[in-house]
Regions:
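N-terminal cap/leader regions of alpha/beta-hydrolase-fold enzymes
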Residues: 1-242
């Protein structure tokens, strides 16, 4: 029985406090792969923490990234949008906060991380964040997006991606414009990235979110969620093998 532990990690960016969550199996003492998890637009939440715990139980150290600041914990969609949009519109700022989370994952001394085995994954807005972090040339062996947007202001940055990319997309997702898919494919192909895009038929936005219940827009789909997480774990097993 794994003993998954959650600890707060508080740090500053430009004088502002951020509080991420470090999630790991306390029974494992040897260095293990480290993952930065970018949550959906609701930020650090109980739901995001549950996902981080599930992933960490597979033998990873997960840093659930606070991208808004310790004082910002959205309680509804309007608050989430107000916190998210400045980052969506300023990818340099977004990447600064993602890199800070990656730095914290590697520098913390609570759970031993193998710094040669790093990856990022995220959900919705967080999927965009994981891909953008990869586009900066961060030392990631994999970047995984669950029902995230695929656009980037600088498609040429795809050439900076060092690892493999996995996009898990709902074919019926109305919140990811269809024109983003071929643009993303072109970006990846032009950059020579090892990439996979899986489009799940009948799946809407937020298909991994157990609380998503907005018919025709955002809907939890357990079957698709299970397949998507299995795909991520398959990729992580591949890139982290010795």
């Amino acid at each position: 029985m794994s003993a998954v532990t959650v600890q707060s990690v508080v740090y500053q960016i430009d004088g502002i406090d951020y509080e991420s969550r470090l999630v790991f199996d306390a029974d494992i003492v040897s260095p293990r792969p480290g993952l930065v998890m970018a949550p959906n637009w609701m930020g650090v939440s109980e739901g995001a923490e549950r996902i981080a715990q599930s992933v960490a139980s597979k033998g990873y150290v997960v840093l659930l990234a606070d991208l808004y600041g310790q004082a910002v914990r959205p309680q509804n969609g309007d608050q989430a949008a107000a916190a998210m949009m400045p980052l969506k519109n300023d990818r340099a700022l977004l990447n600064k906060r993602m890199h800070a989370a990656l730095d914290q994952l590697q520098s913390q001394t609570v759970a031993s991380v193998n710094s040669a085995k790093l990856a990022a994954f995220g959900f919705c807005f967080g999927g965009c964040c994981a891909l953008e972090l990869a586009r900066t040339g961060a030392p990631l062996l994999a970047a995984v997006s669950f029902h995230g947007t695929l656009d980037t202001p600088n498609p040429a940055d795809g050439k900076n991606i060092k690892g493999k990319v996995l996009v898990l997309h709902g074919a019926a997702d109305p919140l990811v414009p269809k024109e983003q898919l071929p643009a993303f494919e072109k970006e990846m192909n032009d950059a020579g990235v090892d990439w996979t895009l899986t489009s799940f038929g009948g799946a809407y936005h937020s298909f991994t979110d157990t609380e998503a219940n907005n018919p025709g827009v955002q809907m939890y789909n357990k079957t698709v969620a299970d397949r998507a997480f299995a795909a991520m774990h398959y990729l992580l097993d591949e890139v982290f093998q010795d």
